[in-house]
Amino acid sequence: WVGLTVVWGFVFYFIKLALESFEPVQVAFGRCLLGALTLVLVAAVTRTRLPRGRVVWIDLAVVALLLNTLPYLLFAWAETRVSSVLAGIWNAATPLFVLAFGLLITPWEKVTREKLVGLAIGFLGALVVLGFWDMGNGGDPLGSLACIAATACYGIGMPYTRRRLVHRSEPAVSLMS
């Protein structure tokens, strides 16, 4: 877990670094391209076939839009207005959005008192960490709003993936490629 935390935390620093030489759209495109090439290479090496069928490709396009394209673009644009630290802190709200949208998108997820209390505590904790009452010192509110929109994309995309793709028989690397 520590390794993942370090890697995910540094992503926002590297986005800020990339923005010194590239526009936000170029940073987002580069991230998507690098990820896609890596996954296609893994699929080729493991001789994994790509999925077939129109419906699965539509679902994959929606997932790519929600979990890659939009958040990458929103975070890159946001970091032209807020610090990489603030962007990373906003990203920590992702589990809150996943829980909230998961309850809406996946009908088998039942709303329980524990989930609602967890959501409320998480939201209040995020406000404390972010110093919501003093946002003026943290950067441009539009940059923060872009970060929130990016985490909301993750929050919608993850339960959508669970609902539409998890049950499929194709290997995960095939679906991700």
Predicted region positions:
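Specific transmembrane alpha-helical segments of multi-pass solute transporters/efflux pumps
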Residues: 7-15, 40-91, 124-129
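Hydrophobic transmembrane alpha-helices of multi-pass small-molecule transport proteins
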Residues: 39, 61, 93, 100-101, ...
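Structural signature of transmembrane alpha-helix termini at the membrane-water interface
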Residues: 41-48, 73, 100, 104, ...
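Specific alpha-helical transmembrane segments that line the substrate/conduction pathway
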Residues: 26-37, 67, 72-110, 150
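Glycine-/small-residue-enriched transmembrane alpha-helix faces in small-molecule transporters
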Residues: 1-29, 77, 137-163
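Membrane-interface interhelical linkers
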Residues: 1-3, 36-63, 76, 80-81, ...
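Transmembrane alpha-helical segments that form core, pore/gating elements
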Residues: 39, 98-100, 122, 136-177
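Hydrophobic residues within alpha-helical transmembrane segments
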Residues: 3, 29-34, 62, 66, ...
